[in-house]
A protein has these predicted regions:
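Conserved helicase RecA-like core
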Residues: 1-300
Length: 300
């Protein structure tokens, strides 16, 4: 996706990138954004919309990393559940690139705490996921509020009708780039499945954890309730487990992720949506406690 998207984005045209998670698309839009941003201009110049807080934080970290030898570039992740006054202060202090969830970006636009006059690039990352989560109106509000003379770039794993409607309304002759599923990046992963009665799942998971002793593992569940139930069950069995889902406050989520990254928590139990964008190197095992409702979730 990078080889195809970077030249197209740098040329300034509107773009639709159909690519799954794990294809390196953050750099595909991050590098062109950094090429186009003027470090001397201490005004907002690019906005990236992401479906979740975790993904916004991760994308911001990656773009910061890409810009570490460029002086004067400020990247700010903004999302709900975080102190808005701090965000306003950071926006006033010359942030050029905002990575945010649609709701919070819209909130700043309504409060007039985000000045959009110099915005030349808007990226929708995981656009289908944002629509699934009910962000369509927020996205349309944001796109309607930025200058018309801009580049609009959209990345999505799937292309349902609502995405095509947004494309038609807000993009001009967008170039379509596809990275097909055959090229999906999951090398060197061994997969196994066990046919287990629901009430035996907890016992089987515990046995597998004992046999293989993965350093860090992620367990995916389909519901928040199941996450809470399983975390309590694992803690009761003496495992170092913690849960992650959308009902948790941002501080709690940050604390859980910090514990997992440092290895204090060995088992992260999460819903698919909350876990989107999690990037931890040392994960040795992934358990799909429930079968994901979407094959894209299964791969990511």
């Amino acid at each position: 996706i990078q080889a195809k998207a970077i030249p197209a984005m740098i040329s300034g045209i509107d773009l639709i990138g159909q690519a799954q998670t794990g294809t390196g698309k953050t750099a595909a839009f991050g590098i062109p954004i950094l090429e186009k941003v003027d470090p001397k201009l201490k005004k907002l110049q690019a906005i990236v919309l992401c479906p979740t807080r975790e993904l916004a934080i991760q994308v911001a970290d990656e773009i910061r990393n890409l810009s570490r030898y460029m002086h004067g570039i400020k990247v700010l992740p903004i999302y709900g559940g975080q102190d808005i006054v701090k965000q306003i202060r950071s926006l006033k202090s010359g942030t050029q690139i905002v990575i945010g969830t649609p709701g919070r970006v819209m909130d700043h636009m309504r409060r007039k705490t985000m000045k959009l006059d110099f915005v030349h690039t808007v990226v929708l990352d995981e656009a289908d996921e944002m629509l699934n989560m009910g962000f369509r109106e927020d996205i349309e509000f944001v796109l309607s509020g930025v200058p018309e003379e801009r580049q609009t770039v959209l990345f999505s794993a799937t292309m349902p009708k609502p995405i095509m409607e947004i494309t038609k309304k807000f993009q001009n002759n967008a170039k379509v780039i596809k990275v097909t599923k055959k090229e999906l990046t999951v090398p060197n992963i061994e997969q196994y499945y066990y046919d287990v009665k629901p009430k035996k799942k907890e016992e089987v998971l515990s046995r597998l954890l004992d046999i293989y002793s993965p350093r860090l593992s992620v367990v995916f569940c389909n519901t928040k309730k199941q996450v809470d139930l399983l975390v309590n069950a694992l803690l009761g069995r003496g495992y170092f487990a913690a849960g992650l889902h959308g009902d948790m406050k941002q501080e709690q989520r940050d604390r859980v992720m910090q514990g997992f990254r440092t290895g204090k928590t060995e088992i992260l139990v999460a819903t698919d949506v909350a876990a989107r964008g999690i990037d931890v190197d040392e994960v040795e095992a992934v358990f799909n406690y429930d079968l994901p409702q979407d094959d894209e979730y299964y791969v990511h």
